[in-house]
Amino acid sequence: MNGILSTTEVDSQAELSCPAPAKLNLFLHVVGRREDGYHLLQTVFRLVDFADQLHFGLRADGVIKLHTPTPGVPEEQDLCVRAAKLLQRESGTPWGANIFLEKRIPMGGGLGGGSSDAATTLLALNRLWKLGWRRNQLLKLAPELGADVPVFVFSENAFAEGIGEKLLPIALPPAWYLILTPPVHVSTAKVFSSKELTRNTIPIKIPPFSTEQGHNDLEPVVCASYPEVARHLEWLRQLEGARMAAMTGSGACVFAEFATESGARSALGKIPYGMKGFVAQGLDRHPLHDFAEQ
C-alpha cells in the first residue's frame, strides 16, 4: 500500500482527512452514440491505492472555501467546490467547509483524479455534516459533476454501461499495476470526436465475461495522435510476467497488470530513461465505502 489510503478524524466533530483513489479502465468499449452526442460505453473500473488526499474542516458560517486552488482553474469551477456546494444546496445544511487538497494523481491522465476528488468531497461532507444520506442519494448528484464521478461514489470496482451511470459491482482478482505517465496531455473531446474512432464494438454480455475479452477503443486514436503514448504502451507490452497492458480512459496514462507486487516493482526498475511511472495495488472497494449506507 502507498500509505496515503488513511482516513482520520480529528476531534471527530470538526475535521476529516480522506483519500481520493485513482481508477483504471481495464477495458473501454464504445458501443454506440446517443442522439445528444454522448457516447455509449462499456468498461470495467478498477480502483487502485494511489490517491490524492483531501482535508475538510467544519465551518459554521456556511462558506465553502478551497485553500489549495489549482492554477488556472477558477474556484467556482473546481470539482471539489462544485461537489460541496451541490451537496450543501440539495441537503439544505447550514454548514460550510474548509477544503485542502494534496494532489498526487496526474491531471488529464485518464486516472479519474478530479472525479475522485469530487466523490470524496461528497462522501466526506456527508459524514462531516452528519447528513446521513444513503449512497443512492449521493449517486443522483454525481452525474452533474462528471461522467466518472458515479463510480467513485459507488465505491466498488464496477462494470459500467450507458454513459458510465449504469453500474454493477464486479469481483476482480488481486493485482498490482505498473502505471506509466507519458509527458503529453490528451484532449478527451478530440479523441471522442475523431472520425477514426470505432463506435460499434459489439457489447459484452454480463455475466459472464473476462477483462481479457476487452480492449480500449480509444487507444488506436490516441496512439496515432500521440506517439509518446504508443511508445510507452509498446514497452509495457513486451514485459515478461504482465497479464495485460492497456491505456486507461482516454489516456495518456498506460498500465500493465501483474499478479504480484514483486513483479510490478521489478518492471518499474527496468523502465527506460525518460519514462516515469509508479506501482499501485488494486483495491476491492473505496476506502470511504462505509461513509454512505447502501
Curated annotation (Swiss-Prot):
Active site as annotated: 23, 148
Q: Name one GO molecular function term.
A: 4-(cytidine 5'-diphospho)-2-C-methyl-D-erythritol kinase activity
Q: What is the top-level taxon of the source organism? A: Bacteria
| Gene3D superfamilies reported for this sequence | 3.30.230.10, GHMP kinase, C-terminal domain
Functional pathway: Isoprenoid biosynthesis; isopentenyl diphosphate biosynthesis via DXP pathway; isopentenyl diphosphate from 1-deoxy-D-xylulose 5-phosphate: step 3/6
Record field: catalytic activity: 4-CDP-2-C-methyl-D-erythritol + ATP = 4-CDP-2-C-methyl-D-erythritol 2-phosphate + ADP + H(+)
Keyword annotations: ATP-binding, Isoprene biosynthesis, Kinase, Nucleotide-binding, Transferase
EC number of the protein:
2.7.1.148
**GO annotation, biological process:** isopentenyl diphosphate biosynthetic process, methylerythritol 4-phosphate pathway; terpenoid biosynthetic process
Describe its function: Catalyzes the phosphorylation of the position 2 hydroxy group of 4-diphosphocytidyl-2C-methyl-D-erythritol.
Q: Which family does it belong to?
A: Belongs to the GHMP kinase family. IspE subfamily.
Query: Which PANTHER family would you find in this protein's record?
Result: 4-DIPHOSPHOCYTIDYL-2-C-METHYL-D-ERYTHRITOL KINASE, CHLOROPLASTIC
Q: What is this protein called?
A: 4-diphosphocytidyl-2-C-methyl-D-erythritol kinase
The record lists the organism as Nitrosospira multiformis (strain ATCC 25196 / NCIMB 11849 / C 71)
Q: Which gene encodes it?
A: ispE
